[in-house]
UniProtKB/Swiss-Prot annotation:
Functional note: Probable molecular chaperone that assists the folding of proteins upon ATP hydrolysis. Plays a role in the assembly of BBSome, a complex involved in ciliogenesis regulating transports vesicles to the cilia. May play a role in protein processing in limb, cardiac and reproductive system development. May play a role in cytokinesis.
UniProt binding sites for ATP: E192, R193, M194, V195, L196, G197, K198, S199
Stretches for region Substrate-binding apical domain: 198-370
Tissue: Widely expressed in adult and fetal tissues. Expressed in the developing heart, brain retina, limb buds, as well as in the developing neural tube. Expressed in the embryo in the first and second branchial arches. Expressed in parafin embedded tissue sections of brain, kidney, retina, olfactory epithelium and the ependymal layer of ventricles. Detected only in restricted regions of these tissue sections, including the ciliated border of renal tubules, the connecting cilium and the inner and outer nuclear layers of retina, and the ciliated layer of olfactory epithelia.
Chief location category: cytoplasm
Domain of life the protein comes from: Eukaryota
Phenotype on disruption: Mice demonstrate retinal degeneration, failure of spermatozoa flagella formation, elevated blood pressure, olfactory deficits, and social dominance, but no polydactyly nor vaginal abnormalities. The phenotype closely resembles the phenotype of other mouse models of Bardet-Biedl syndrome (Bbs2 deficient and Bbs4 deficient). Obesity is associated with hyperleptinemia and resistance to the anorectic and weight-reducing effects of leptin.
GO molecular function annotation: ATP binding; RNA polymerase II-specific DNA-binding transcription factor binding; unfolded protein binding
Alphabetical list of SUPFAM superfamilies matching this protein: GroEL apical domain-like, GroEL equatorial domain-like
GO annotation, biological process: artery smooth muscle contraction; brain morphogenesis; cartilage development; cerebral cortex development; chaperone-mediated protein complex assembly; cilium assembly; detection of mechanical stimulus involved in sensory perception of sound; face development
Family, per entry: Belongs to the TCP-1 chaperonin family.
Organism in which the protein naturally occurs: Mus musculus
Name this protein carries in UniProt: Molecular chaperone MKKS
Amino acid sequence: MSRLEAKKPSLCKTEPLTSEKVRSTLSVLKGVIASCYGPSGRLKQLHNGLGGCVYTTSQSSALLRNLSVTHPVLKILTSSVQNHVSCFSDCGLFTAILCCNLIENIQRLDLTPATAIKLNKYLLSLCTSYLKSEACSCRIPVDFRSTHTFLSLVHSILTSKPACMLTRKETDHIGALILKAFLLTIPESTEERMVLGKSIIVPLKGQRVTDSTVLPGLLIEASEVQLRRLLPTQKASGLRVALFCTSLSGDFSNAGEGVVVAHYQVSLENAVLEQLLNLGRRLVTDHVDLVLCQKVIHPSLKQFFSERHVMAIDRVGVTLMESLSKVTGATPIGSLNPIVSTTYGSVKDVCSARFGSKHFFHLLPNEATVCTLLLCSRNDTAWEELKLTCQTAMHVLQLTIKEPWVLLGGGCTETHLAAYVRHKVHHEAEAIVRDDGCTQAKLHVAAEAFCSALESVAGSLEHDGGEILIDTKYGHLWSCQADSASVGNWSDTLSRCGCGLYNSQEELSWSVLRSTYHPFAPQTCLPQAALGSASNLTVDCFTAKLSGLQVAVETANLILDLSYVIEDKN
């Protein structure tokens, strides 16, 4: 008998944020995350100390999934960001950096947690109300008559992921493929409730990125021998399909627990095989041309199908089942019981395809909204990062269909929001404190901490020691290289703002970001030219960024409100 140990008492810590260890750990986490932010973000190599593969990334989903944090405060932060990313796919780094900045800034102030939380909530409501209003000059409506805005959005996502290691030509090629794949998932017939289809990403490593392509329907990898043996003759009316999610190998894997009782001299193998052959006869009688099985098909049943010119493909895997059901219209069959004819589906044709050294069955649908993105890359690491980026871009396009706006990127939304909040608080402080019941001094310091946190996120885009500026007309971010900074004449040094909307030849004045400047009212009228020049802009997903802003502030408030941390050490 193993030695029994007495249970250790739980460890209770008060005011966790007052601990210097927690503060320093939070600062380190912020540094790691902030250094990944933006197109010139630094890559991180993650690997387990006990071995395993090395993962190179700058994306929040991969970074936080592989980053081990132990303190409960950090777990709250990382879990909140991961939950946001699982729902919206984008703006994870933005959310994490803003949350860390808010916590650090509030901790330096002489404010009670209750007051800080109340003021943070008010300042958040100012931001969200403005971003949702028609007066917002950070928000651009999506024109569905053109693909320019969609391409800008996809291009912005691709260029913000340096671990994909794409050239400009490759970025344009992949961006166009992502948009094409997305458009293929939109049904032609619009009903009251539109249901988007699905795009499957198939790997082809060791090939040029520009060899990537999009195909309607579905690719199922197979050997060259299988293709020669199984491809049927074409039929004018299409091919009838049966889709099985249960094993057709004759095993008892689905029998569950218990005892199987068999009569004397009865062969279980022969009995099961006869049942499988009876199923095969039923499929032949029902004029099924193609049998797809998630698991294994018995060799004798395969031979039976082959002799009757029925194509049988097994081991397709669970990941393709949903897509196969959409492509064929078939309902997955989960037993060997008599089959109802309504469970069958159909495809237009099945043909062979070869890409690189791989061979595929290509299922061509009748009208299904399923397509395959054959994604090529030079190595495994770049392919994994590119796959994750393509999935993010697809999801962001879906979100944009639901809420057809984009936000200006390149840090301009953050600096513009900070300028808007500063001006609002400066001119309406008396009315705000009358409603909220705090002093103007507390409101001003809380607003400064909030705006500084937003500006720090924008400043995290600069990784090479350059100067970060804000113009005092639009409140947009401007970046100047370290070796060309010229405080005397910024207009000769600067080119365009972070999002690309404005150029430095306009009559503008600038101030160094995070320096002291008088609050100003940023122009809240978006120029009409912006609507036509969206293809040249850096933009972010409206839905994802708005959610990220809310999650960051709410998580910071939750952490600031922590009084005790109780850990079970057993």
